[in-house]
Amino acid sequence: PDHYDVSATGVGVVEADDLLGPDRVRPGDVVIAMGSSGLHSNGYSLARKVLLEIDRMSLAGHVEEFGRTLGEELLEPTRIYAKDCLALTAETQVRTFCHVTGGGLAGNLERVVPHGLVAELDRGTWTPAPVFTMIAQRGRIERAEMEKTFNMGIGMVAVVAPEDTDRALAILTARHLSCWTLGTVAKGKDGPRAKLV
């Protein structure tokens, strides 16, 4: 009686010729990152352990790095990218999308990159939001573990044809979405199909 479980399911229909996926990804394609609004829906157990249990921070306490309370930072609503993705598919050659959830950026991107290719992602193209830095520092969490647990500031990724890179970035920027070129797709061998370098 004191607990509620809220869930939702979305169902859609797509023409087979319009279906996006790994089979469309080619060497030379460009990986575009779309900024997250915060933790989104993953990593809260670790965030609570580090910030509330280990560091004993108050949810109501103002945090200088965030410019607001810890509670406000942790409760920032998840950005929904559906309209942004639809805008991209309407005007560019999108090969596929990747929603960055549990498993992190590389773990999720591997699902949409076919065998024989690798998405090479440049860590130097963005700075994770302060909440991720704080969790890592105060919890003494290794970078690899952070990158497997959290979105690290990237909530959605689009893989687009190289000639559409500038157009895709312009479309997302016009929609007031933080975005940037994260990397490219190259021929690969057996091993990870996405890697941060």
Question: Where do the PLM segments sit?
Answer:
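Glycine-/charge-enriched secondary-structure boundary and capping motifs
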Residues: 1-4, 58, 64-75, 79-197
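Basic, gly/Ser/Thr/Pro-rich low-complexity segments located predominantly at protein N termini
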Residues: 17, 26, 40-43, 48, ...
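Acidic, glycine-rich loop-and-beta core segments that form the ion-binding/anion-interacting portion
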Residues: 25-72
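N-terminal low-complexity, intrinsically disordered patches enriched in charged
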Residues: 21, 52, 111-112
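Short alpha-helical scaffold segments that flank and stabilize functional sites
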Residues: 11, 46, 50, 168-171
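Glycine-rich anion-binding loops of enzyme active sites
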Residues: 1-45, 184
